[in-house]
């Protein structure tokens, strides 16, 4: 890891295979906490590259505990967090609204790392018992139209860095990775991101997948659709800027 850190400190970039190997080594406990914290810090100082993000994502997907809920054709609604706005858990609340409307939702989340409360904190406080048991997840989907996947149960690398992320208290590239590695690989996904470069990075990454996606970012900094500023939406076919007034009016056929 020392040689890799020196390279990164000199503003060099990792290849996709190198990035994948690093995440695998983190999951296997080959690096100490200080080394992992240093790696996280690198990506606070510069943007992550497409190849680095792809390599990190591939490693997490390869190591995940797979969950097959494809028969439900579910949607995941998720935000990166890290926008510094201290809002309540909007994407988590949205999942229940969508499930209440009869659509199947598979929510993948974790404890808060850069905020007081992450999706798992909310679920836990409401009495949800985290599980990786596929039968229980299916029953939850059948009875409530929603299943919750607590990320550390399905990915060893995310579990390995949880305490480090919490102690640092700053957003990291793991914020970027969480929404990209739902072990169900949902049919549909709505993702909120904290800046425009990440919106385009996500959009580029998802072009390689079969997921029907929409990535949103509000120009006032929220990783959500905002009521106080224009927001950008990137989908497979297009990228478009919308105004909040659209939410109160009937959209045109083109929208």
Language-model segment annotations:
Residues 74-116, 175-181:
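Glycine/serine-rich anion-binding loops at beta->alpha junctions
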């Amino acid at each position: 890891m020392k040689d890799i850190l020196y390279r990164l400190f000199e503003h060099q970039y990792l290849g996709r295979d190198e990035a994948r190997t690093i995440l695998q080594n983190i999951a296997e406990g080959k690096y100490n906490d200080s080394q992992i914290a240093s790696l996280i810090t690198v990506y606070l100082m510069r943007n992550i590259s497409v190849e680095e993000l792809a390599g990190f994502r591939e490693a997490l997907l390869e190591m995940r505990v797979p969950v097959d809920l494809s028969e439900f054709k579910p949607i995941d609604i998720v935000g990166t967090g890290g926008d510094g706005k201290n809002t309540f858990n909007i994407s988590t609340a949205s999942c229940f609204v969508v499930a209440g409307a009869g659509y199947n939702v598979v929510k993948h989340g974790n404890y808060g790392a850069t905020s007081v409360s992450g999706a798992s904190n909310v679920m836990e406080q409401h009495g949800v018992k985290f599980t990786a048991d596929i039968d229980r997840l299916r029953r939850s989907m059948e009875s409530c139209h929603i299943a919750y996947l607590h990320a550390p149960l399905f990915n060893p690398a995310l579990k390995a860095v949880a305490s480090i992320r919490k102690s640092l208290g700053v957003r990291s590239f793991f914020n970027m990775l969480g929404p990209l590695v739902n072990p169900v690989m949902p049919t549909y996904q709505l993702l909120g991101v904290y800046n425009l470069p990440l919106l385009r990075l996500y959009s580029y990454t998802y072009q390689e997948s079969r997921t029907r996606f929409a990535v949103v970012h509000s120009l006032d900094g929220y990783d959500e659709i905002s009521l106080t500023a224009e927001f950008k939406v990137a989908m497979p076919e297009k990228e478009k800027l919308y105004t909040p007034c659209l939410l109160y009016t009937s959209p045109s056929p083109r929208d």
